[in-house]
């Protein structure tokens, strides 16, 4: 392939889409205590909305329990309310110093709901990867129209780009299968 066509930017962007999907998957409750579960929760503190991990230490002392220790004890009630109001369906217990967050078993219905959600997240990731491919294809075709690359180089670049796209979509599908298996584990 010609040196004119560099797919490293496309690969970087596809990798970013994959990492975004994996990060989203980490925030989905599976019945096991995982501090990443609280990553999406923001707390109203000091006149602004902040991620919970910025205002508290989060630990997992047991497989089914998270503990949240605020750096500022005045934020206990605010953190508790933010967790209670979130879509996680968890019931925080405030003892005046720390918040204990027991992670209950998932019901069959909730598991199916979460599987639908992770499938949607995976599809969004696939769409992101395909959008990167589309953008890169436009660039390759533009280079061909402007005469900067030959038709053979264009075909080779498109084939290489398709291989890259397929590889990243496969990785997203593998991450999805792993998360689905984790969610169905009783």
Curated annotation (Swiss-Prot):
UniProt-listed InterPro entries: Ribosome_recyc_fac, Ribosome_recyc_fac_dom, RRF_sf
Main localization of the protein described in the UniProt heading: cytoplasm
Keyword Cytoplasm included in the entry's annotation: yes
GO molecular function: ribosomal large subunit binding
Gene Ontology terms describing biological process: translational termination
Key words, A-Z: Cytoplasm, Protein biosynthesis
CDD domains hit by this protein: RRF
Function: Responsible for the release of ribosomes from messenger RNA at the termination of protein biosynthesis. May increase the efficiency of translation by recycling ribosomes from one round of translation to another.
Family to which the UniProt record says this protein belongs: Belongs to the RRF family.
NCBIfam families named among the record's database cross-references: frr
Protein name: Ribosome-recycling factor
Lineage: Bacteria, Bacillati, Actinomycetota, Rubrobacteria, Rubrobacterales
Gene transcribed to yield this protein: frr
